[in-house]
Amino acid sequence: MAASFLHGIETIETSTGPVPITVVKSSVIGLVGSAPLWAAVGAPAMWQPSWVVAAGQQLVDPNGNIQQCSTVGTTGTSAPAWSTTLNATTADGTAVWKLVTIAGTLLQAPTLVNFTANPNIAGSAAAYGPLIQGYTIPYALAAIQAQGAGQAIVVNVFNPDLHYTAITAQAMALPASGPQVLNLGHMGVWNVVVKNSGGSTTYINGTDYSLDPINGIVTQKAGGAITTGEALSVSFSYADPSKVQDSDVVGTVTGTMYTGIQALRTTYGTMGFFPKILIAPGYSQDPATAAALLSTAETVRAVALIDAPPSISPATAIANRGVAGNVFDTSSDRALLCYPQEQFSDLGLIPTGITLNSAGTPVQNAANATAVGPYSQWVAGTIAAKDLAQGYWWSPSNTQMTGLLGPDVTLYASVLDAASDVNNLNAQGIVTVFNAFGTGLRVWGNRSAAYPTVTTPNNFISVRRTMDVIEESVELAMLQFIDQPISNALISAILASVNAFIRSLIGRGALVAGSASYNPAENPSNQVAAGQLVFDIDVMPPPPAERLTFNVYIDSTLLSGLGDTNALTAVTLNA
């Protein structure tokens, strides 16, 4: 209260009592992988104006020449006319450039994706490009969306500035007759240089030929210098997702720059929430990638879904639980071990499969074949969808999945046989797939990798995730109490807030019981004098009904009712 002189009346408004606690998001997936941003709806051609650049590395222009700004702060004649941010310099005073965005989508920056069929809506999954073989993000987004999930935070690590293959002076020739079109044999091309067969003449894009960089097509231009049927020497680079390394996915922290999986740690500061289901399909079977997922999961209170390699037997998957250095050799209650990989109908484009029709028009050809993909992407979508439909306190187990054809190995599944493959896998903390007659393909397994080493209730996936939601929700809500004067009123307000939250969770079914309390014995005067308060929260989330047992008795005394006239009815038999 102000101590200054006042000849009048004042009103002091003070907020007291409990505050509402908001439940944090539980169903957001964190996805790290590779995406063909260059093929996304509305994406520019390689190295065009809307490909923003920043300091760090030289650019190569469409003719294969190194472009570098010679006059700091201006475009200069030797700098790309379409460059931006000309303010970074090297030791010699020149500005150099590095690709950082494509069509508005930041490389390495976590981006929130909402699953919508409209590719023109900001945050659409379509911004990460179509299904093209070799790129993991579009396939994962399709698997997630098929389960009905709502949102994902995506980190793309594919960068054509780094992940490409260069073709030098490849001998090619235009057709002797018909449409004068040259198929380079790869999608996503840039740095295309077309010369005559001897290499003495360099033809000019836009004058002598036109380029379709997405499909990798060079077309003769009327009036240009290229002649019908001419033999040519062509150099170019093409986007090559096979060049993405596990280290790219793991990422780094350099100053304020977070890349790969590490970038998921930054999302609370930019979006107000963390992803709670972490996947890196196609990469998580690598030990370093799995370790990065788990480390990040510990930091952001998430679960990390880790895949087994394709085509391994159930016995091998179980044995890997005890192989040092294997991704399945963990007892973390944040690790969900996903086995086996799954078959699905691959409708993705073949990046080397572009053909030309009789008019010389490029035709994109889809695989239209059965392929195998990481199980984690379907499990992640199932967890997120069940969170939205039922609640985060429900186990993902026994939930039917869509968009997949079945495991890549044969699994014996039965709820009646303890020796079945799926039961043996569950008994070792492995989440698998259940498929019996008429059941459909179902996520099967309630327990994290903590089981069987850890037998406390938090080895259940649903219990671990429920505790994460409760703990983080309470912590974030307590920010408004930080730095208030310690008093009985403050203690009462905190307890009332937390207990009201717990009661609401009990009412929803997220908790069986629980309460918050303040124990004076845990708060000695010297500790309180240091500004520190300790509260106890006792809660119990509902464990899943994993095993049902019926005690059945054959009771011969029930035969004593036979012959009772009250139990008999007249029956007329027809001849």
Locations of regions flagged by a protein language model:
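Surface-exposed assembly/interface segments
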Residues: 1-62, 73, 77, 83-575
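Short beta-strand-centered aromatic/proline hotspots
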Residues: 67-71
